[in-house]
Amino acid sequence: MLYQIHTAPLARKAEIDLPASKSLSNRALILKALSGGRGSLSHLSDSDDTHVMQAAFDGDHTLVDIGAAGTSMRFLTAYYASTPGAEVTLTGSERMKQRPIAILVDALRSLGADIRYTEAEGFPPLHICGKQLRGGALTIDGSTSSQYISALLMIAPTLTDGLTLHLTGQITSRPYIDMTLSMMRRFGAQCAMEGPVITVSPRAYVPADLSVESDWSAASYWYELLALCHYGKVASGLQDGALNEAASVLQDKVFSKTSGSQDFALSEVTLLGLHPDSLQGDSRVSEYFAELGIATRFTDRGAVLSATDQPLPTEVCWNLAGQPDLAQTLIVTCCALDVRFRISGLHTLRIKETDRITALQTELRRLGFVVGAEGDDVMYWNGERCESQCPVVISTYHDHRMALAFAPMALCLHHDALYVDDPGVVSKSYPSYWDHLRQIGLSVSEAKL
């Protein structure tokens, strides 16, 4: 399926009922299961990832297919391995079978787990025979996926000897580890983190009632939309194939400001269910976009975003090691706003739903932006441009965040449509996204080329 997105007169103000956080939802489901299935969870995410997790706990299964849900693969691997009597084969999509899991499996085996690979060594599918694990001390590379670490932490109270986890090197996505520990405490766990050492005592979880807050990752696309409405450039297209070598000449001849146009009247967005004291690391999106002219204030209903008149920076330098899921949003936004950037902390992007570094470079080139990369950790843009494609068709690579981050670029194509391939991929985290874009006035419809 292909969607075409056209600019249209937009609402001046919008109120968006964001999806619940899938990061919090998935942790809550695991912790509820480890608590004996008791307690009440409300406002769970409606995402594919969370549905997969719920289905895994719905009855007895000998085969669990988690599709493209990486979080579910990591969390359920640890859960089943530590559940006496469980016997299950855990599999997923073809892409999932290419995503490494050896670090987690090796760690669980060192704790006594019975896990074997059924196809390629080091990758799903996995055959797991659950048993009581002994626990003890474990050392793991802190720069690995935080989901491995969170998976181990959540089962730690059920281990005979608890768990002392030593993290070596740079710790990746620390906010997600903090989120996991905080939620474990809500379910009665005794855990502490001092420097690179996390200690979890053996102690039975207790049931908890929990309402999941809205998703800050989903909020990032509304920051992007508002920034593009207020500051973005509207491209007339390079249909004649002529290339402007100087960025200033290109900006004058090819781009015009959107601000003030009736087609781009969106000036305030209220995002329901967001809190300033969030457990989610991606809540820092408000700080990043404050540098890009978008202010945030909080009411008892959520976050209210509004555009300011502050000048945009010529260049930004950010480290997203704690918020890698914001990379696509921020990189696409900076290109659209003509803000040069150097962004580090991206070393987990190549093993996400797709190789996000390569995917970003490829799709931004379709829009006329030449973005560089240094190894697996850094992406940068120095203002270099190339001939854009017409029409612009964005490939999503089975990655929800590619569709979510690139769709707002429709605001930057003047009267031309932006096309998004496989738009249904957004159901992985934000199923109502296209309806919400229509709600503010964008034209989103099926198309054929």
Positions of predicted regions on the chain:
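Short, structured segments at the rim of ligand-binding sites
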Residues: 1-449
